[in-house]
Amino acid sequence: MKYICNPVNINYRFQFNMDPRKGGILQIDREAADPSMIMYHGRYYVFASMTLGVWVSDDLVNWENHRLPEDLPLYDYAPDVRVMGDYVYFCASRRTEACDRYRTKDVLNGPYEKIPGNFPFWDPNMFIDDDGRIYFYWGCSNTTPIWGTELDPQTLLPIGEKQALIEGDPHHIGYERVGEDHSVAPASEEEIEMKFQGFLKRTGVTEDQLPPGHAPMIRGMFSNMPYIEGAWMDKHNGKYYLQYAFPGTEYNVYGDGCYVSDSPLGPFVLADNAPFSYKPGGFLPGAGHGSSMEDRNANWWHIATMRISVHHDFERRVGMFPAGFDADGDFFCNQRYGDWPLAVEEAQMDPWRGPAWYLLSYNKKMTASSCMEGNEPEKAADENVQTWWRAASADRKEWLQMDLGKEYTVNMVQVNFADVVEGIEPAGELVGSDSRRYIEERDLKTQWKLLGSLDGENWFTIEDKSAAETDLTHDQVLREEGIKVRYLCLTDIAVAYGMKPCVSGLRVFGIAEGEAPEVPEFTAKRVGPMNMDVEIAPVDAVGYNILWGSAPDKLYHSYMVFGTQKNVGALVEGREYYVRVDAFNESGITEGKCVKLA
């Protein structure tokens, strides 16, 4: 059997960003985002922003990163890729100049034939209908909609005028509100105008002196309106499913919604199962600006952007989740345990299958050879990708140790590194106009050794990557048959640029002896048209999964929590919901009772 454990285990390249919003400070972080996934000639390809390449796999589990030809717009965001006939078509985003397209019959080696474009766009998506007609969708803004148009099949230029298809509506769609957990309401017109006038006063300009088009954009900055972006179209049983991202990539609630229509250009109605892709909790939250694909075994997958956003708003990773359509045509995505190990077979699979193993490492006792203030060792076991242990030096003798508390059978360990890069200059020239950047082209290395022990004194090697030539910062150690261990020690560590090592998650999975939790009791109360309060009576559990949906058998949305209270702000005004709370511990998952939301 093969297994995945999000984020996708691949090398994520560093960027050096000169962001004008940060006063020109050089920000250094890793990024991959906005993934387009396709199947072409039996192989799987993922094109993601800022990777300089394409990820290739034969099984959706093991991926390799291949450089793409230099003549492609590799520094442009949100690459869109589709298969049409014998060709793979590629394009990406630019705001101020026409975006060209490219096509090839050989993804890895090219050549790529250029197809001139005639207008700028951002977050593109091309869709080929069953009748051969071609449609195009784009948009990334909190002031303008997702646009759509038909394309000429020969030139791939627009036919007719663009049409506004969907717009943000955070006054009625709770999950479109910005902020952590949708905590920020849209600003009033009075608030927007007051902040806009304050901006003009601070900068010493009048509205007439602003460049064309800048006034609406600046007002949008003060509006607290969501970014509606990242369109992706799929068709199933005659219905068109227009997926879109909300409300902003820097939030834990970054996800994908869905509108449905009988026509590729609408009119569209909000899907009954909205949001479609939503993962606000767990170790690594976020599941927005993605793409959906049916594999060669008729399994649907959704691949999407996951949020870190510590060193830069665009510090992001990529996750892949089972998806599908139910008997009523509702498009769903299973993210209940979306960053736990999941079995992947070369066969048709149940998209609602549970995790292969359970989390054994949450808040376990941690020690280390040293640490920086604020980066204590216990932060490598708190299931929060935004916190980490950081050693006091870059010496390979530094170590991080976990005591599981007793002997367990361990099946997988995921070693997640964070990045704190200081005093390093980019190896090449920063390019771009609005936000200049350089993407690291060199192949860096992340090296470590994982030791195990039953008594804390006698150690054996679980995995030795101390001489690895790879740069895998979310690497996995798989022992399908299991190993007996109580103590784990990560040592002999060397990371990129010779920096002090940082570990955001030493995550351990297996199945402990014992019973699953008792059935959890809870209350769920609607508080306002778009929010609900959930309170859980504690049981012997590590955590809980709050599930909700439009019917008892359609609990397609989930929020993993490690506490007993949560306000969920992802409801749609006027819709009825059913809620269930499941409890999990190191031995299993117990389903709760389903209730109608009052």
Please name every model-derived segment.
Residues G257, T446, H474-Q476, F562-N567:
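Short S/T/G- and acidic-enriched coil/turn segments that sit immediately N-terminal to beta-strands
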